Curated annotation (Swiss-Prot):
Cofactor(s) the protein requires to work: Mg(2+)
Subcellular location: Cytoplasm
Amino acids binding Mg(2+): 13, 40
Keywords (A to Z) from UniProt: Cytoplasm, GTP-binding, Ligase, Magnesium, Metal-binding, Nucleotide-binding, Purine biosynthesis
Annotated gene: purA
The name this protein goes by in its record: Adenylosuccinate synthetase
Length: 446
């Protein structure tokens, strides 16, 4: 048995959906532990594309239980749309379970999110406008609506009448927006409640039972380390904790139940929305990476900002998450690049540093210190073993493993499941502590 957390090691959009889908073959349970419809993951199977925002990637495996944990925030309308889409595609959803403790995104959350972002003007955070932040804010203020509240028809009516009237004051007085009709909201969410009722469960207990039965559990994060509310590039972050520690809080399991942590990172770096980005490319190369990598958000369709791989961020992700290994995605996007740069340190106010600054103002003054490596100038998409790779592509991967100080277990070379190189078993392979001595890699190092 192995219980594994999969996290994003950059600013999200790293390809966690594909990696989770691959690992789900060995998992008995897949659990989503934070975030909401602000995150999207795409899985491609036999030329069929599945775009999901809330439902875990493991849903494509009929014998794998899928759980939406208590740390998520759920937009019922979007969740039902995903259920309907999967039903039409012939994918069973009978093995999906929704935590009764998860909070619910309401219409006023979306309205406040969009109006608040607009009011920020030049100080926009880059929110998706899907109501995620306000939903988490209500959770912290203890005024939120949970899934279990929707399951109690009479209690829901009473709670929603009070809450909607309270939010109407904010909508009208603060944002000059039209008020919501409490009865219309109640009627809408009663329909959602009836549809979701068969899926609702005490998911913390369900996960613990799976653990007691020695089943393999895979915890699936959304977004990425640098978007973490506590450890990311604040204030340009999400409202939850995508880091590995969030898996425990967002599902109701203890930290001793986690065996391994796998980080996912692109062979380059992308970011959506506002905030500092030291390796961002504003030239033709940045445009080329965006176009070759189809770097447009699953949720918003926004163009992603593109730049070179940042090893400072990589090392930070290793430290914050306790990564055991790394999955590197989209290596094939670099196939036609003449020279590839990797940021190995920052120059900050005249001083060089290899450590990530948590101060956003200081981070905005960071300039990348690059090491330049030769490109391989040939296709990698059909490679299935390390030996199949062009020597310079293998050298690039070895350098990343060495500079980030964690072994690479998976290399992704395309969107399809089989466009992948499995370097070592990411679930049952050696722990990072056994692979490193004095910071030097003994696997895939230069």
């Amino acid at each position: 048995m192995a219980n594994v957390v999969v996290i994003g090691a950059q600013w999200g959009d790293e390809g966690k959906g594909k990696i989770t889908d691959l690992l789900s073959r060995s998992a008995d349970v897949v659990v989503r532990y934070q975030g909401g419809v602000n995150a999207g993951h795409t899985v491609v199977v036999n030329d069929q594309t599945f775009k999901l925002h809330l439902i875990p990637s493991g849903i494509l495996y009929p014998n794998t239980d899928c759980i939406i944990g208590s740390g998520t925030v759920i937009d019922p309308k979007v969740l039902i749309e995903e259920l309907d889409m999967l039903d039409k595609l012939g994918v069973s959803t009978s093995h999906l379970f929704i935590s009764e403790s998860a909070h619910v995104t309401m219409p006023y959350h979306r309205m406040i999110d969009q109006a608040s972002e607009e009011r920020r003007g030049d100080h926009k955070i880059g929110t998706t406008g899907r109501g995620i932040g306000p939903t988490y804010a209500d959770k912290s203020e203890r005024t939120g609506i949970r899934i279990l509240d929707l399951m109690d028809p009479e209690g829901m009516k009473k709670q929603l009448r009070w809450t909607v009237n309270y939010k109407n004051v904010i909508l009208e007085k603060l944002y000059n927006l039209p008020h919501l009709d409490p009865e219309e909201v109640i009627a809408e969410y009663q329909v959602y409640a009836d549809r979701l009722r068969p899926f609702v469960a005490d998911c913390s207990l369900k996960i613990y039972d799976a653990y007691q039965q020695h089943r393999n559990i895979l915890f699936e994060g959304a977004q990425g380390t640098l978007l973490d509310l506590d450890h990311g590039t604040y204030p340009y972050v999400t409202s939850s904790n995508p880091v590995a520690g969030g898996a425990c809080v967002g599902t109701g399991v203890g930290p001793t139940m986690i065996d391994r942590v796998i980080g996912v990172a692109k062979a380059y770096t992308t970011r959506v929305g506002e905030g500092p980005f030291p390796t961002e490319l504003h030239d033709e190369m940045g445009v080329a990476l965006c176009e070759r990598g189809a770097e447009f958000g699953t949720t918003t369709g926004r163009r992603r900002r593109c730049g070179w791989f940042d090893a400072v961020i990589g090392r930070y992700a290793v430290r914050i998450n306790g990564l055991d290994c790394l999955a590197v995605t989209k290596l094939d996007i670099l196939d036609e690049v003449d020279e590839i740069k990797v940021c190995v340190a920052y120059e900050i106010d005249g001083h060089e540093s290899k450590d990530f600054p948590t101060n956003a103002r200081q981070f905005s003054r960071c300039n990348p210190v690059y090491k330049t490596l030769p490109g391989w100038k040939q296709s990698t998409i059909h490679c299935r073993t390390l030996e199949d790779l062009p020597p310079k592509a293998l050298d690039y991967l070895k350098f990343l493993a060495s500079i980030v100080e964690v072994p690479i277990a998976i290399v992704s070379l395309g969107a399809e499941r089989d466009e992948t190189i499995i370097v070592e078993d990411p679930i049952h392979g050696p722990k990072r502590a056994l692979l490193y001595s004095n910071g030097e890699s003994q696997a895939m190092s230069a």
